[in-house]
Amino acid sequence: MAAKKKLLAELREKSLVELDAFIHENKKALFSLRAEAALQNKVVKKHLFSMYKKNIARSMTVMQEKEGKIDG
């Protein structure tokens, strides 16, 4: 729980450009994880799928808060 709050605090300190880069990095990592699971038949750490998706959602929420679309 503390790690989530720490991540949210770090995300709120970032600028919109940095948030966009963070989202892009996480989407890229999620895509490569999906490709690895589908193509290489390797054992993939399944918890990483939800971690990346949640990080993307958190950062997009913070981005919308900064743009004024969400009251926060």
UniProtKB/Swiss-Prot annotation:
InterPro entries linked: Ribosomal_uL29, Ribosomal_uL29_sf
NCBIfam families: L29 (TIGR00012)
Membrane keyword on record: no
Presence of keyword Ribonucleoprotein: yes
Family: Belongs to the universal ribosomal protein uL29 family.
Record key words, sorted: Ribonucleoprotein, Ribosomal protein
One annotated GO biological process: translation
Molecular-function annotations in GO: structural constituent of ribosome
Gene3D superfamilies the record matches: 1.10.287.310
Upper taxonomic lineage: Bacteria, Pseudomonadati, Chlamydiota, Chlamydiia, Chlamydiales
Gene Ontology CC terms, in alphabetical order: ribonucleoprotein complex; ribosome
Highest taxon of source: Bacteria
Protein's name according to its UniProt entry: Large ribosomal subunit protein uL29
Provenance organism: Chlamydia caviae (strain ATCC VR-813 / DSM 19441 / 03DC25 / GPIC)
